[in-house]
């Protein structure tokens, strides 16, 4: 069997910016002294006149990005998720969101898969924070292909967009020739009638593995990739809930306020069914190898399978 291709979505982000930069001279990239880590360094090398290093000053970077957006250019502000959504929340809210400016935020190193950097850098609250900002699109790709498509879609979208990218290399799963990406539109990756698994980011691949394991036992799970947390594809979520009668959400984020929260809010009003939220259960992360942490917090295929079995 050939080895599955893996690539970190932060690398996909950097590569996508370079390709977009070749086509659009109004694209400007900002970073906060993290060009190597966020992979925006390759854009800096290709287009030095359109790259701004703001130093370790994320709040200022968001203000600068907002100012650039008022000139008609399309700024992509890049830093770790903890600093983009956490440290600079006020500036994102007031300088970007409130005036509805066309700023794109590329937040890398999200979730516990940041690994050894530990709890202070493992942002598991960013979806929740960004969802509360009116008009903000919030998205998280599952692989290289989706990440590149998401960056291009973010450029085309008029308005603020928050995208979370990962440090850990993840399998390419969206290599279907019929694959089409659109912000706000989920993708059914596997059909099933017994329950629905809704996942995003690096949790999509292990959710598919868990579904395959369940199928061996006669349980057919529909698997949906909801890459856009806001706006949520409510039509798809409601239809799946009505069809299967049970829903499980899986995310590398707190179970409070993220994908699970968005799905529960939707279903509570439009299709009440039992829901199990799998994610970071109201705790902080810790320092350790990314793969080991995903296993400890139940976000690997075995952990997801075990929690679904207990639920059904």
Regions found by a protein language model. Give the residues of each.
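Thiamine diphosphate
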Residues: 1-164, 169, ...
């Amino acid at each position: 069997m050939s080895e599955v291709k893996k690539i970190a979505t932060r690398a996909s982000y950097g590569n996508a910016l370079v390709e977009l930069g070749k086509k659009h001279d109004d694209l400007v990239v900002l970073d906060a002294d993290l060009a190597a880590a966020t992979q925006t360094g390759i854009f800096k090398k290709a287009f030095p006149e359109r790259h701004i290093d703001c130093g370790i000053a994320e709040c200022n970077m968001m203000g600068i990005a907002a100012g650039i957006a008022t000139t008609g250019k399309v700024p992509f502000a890049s830093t770790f998720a903890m600093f983009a959504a956490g440290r600079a929340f006020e500036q994102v809210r007031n300088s970007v969101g409130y005036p509805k400016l066309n700023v794109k935020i590329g937040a890398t190193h999200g979730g516990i898969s940041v690994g050894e950097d530990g709890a202070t850098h493992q942002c598991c609250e960013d979806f929740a924070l960004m969802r509360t900002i009116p008009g903000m699109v919030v998205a998280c790709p599952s692989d290289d292909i989706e990440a590149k498509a998401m960056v291009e879609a973010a450029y085309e979208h008029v308005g603020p967009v928050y995208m979370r990218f990962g440090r850990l290399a993840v399998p390419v799963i969206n290599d279907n020739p019929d694959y089409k990406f659109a912000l706000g539109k989920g993708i059914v990756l596997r059909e099933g009638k017994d329950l629905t698994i809704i996942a995003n980011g690096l949790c999509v691949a292990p959710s598919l593995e868990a579904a395959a394991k369940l199928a061996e036992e006669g349980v057919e799970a529909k698997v949906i990739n909801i890459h856009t947390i806001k706006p949520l594809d409510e039509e798809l979520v409601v239809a799946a809930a009505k069809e299967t009668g049970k829903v499980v959400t899986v995310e590398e984020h707190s179970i409070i306020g993220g994908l699970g929260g968005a799905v529960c809010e939707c279903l509570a009003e439009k299709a009440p069914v039992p829901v199990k939220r799998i994610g970071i259960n109201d705790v902080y992360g810790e320092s350790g190898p990314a793969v080991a942490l995903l296993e400890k917090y139940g976000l690997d295929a075995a952990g997801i399978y075990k929690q679904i079995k207990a639920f059904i």
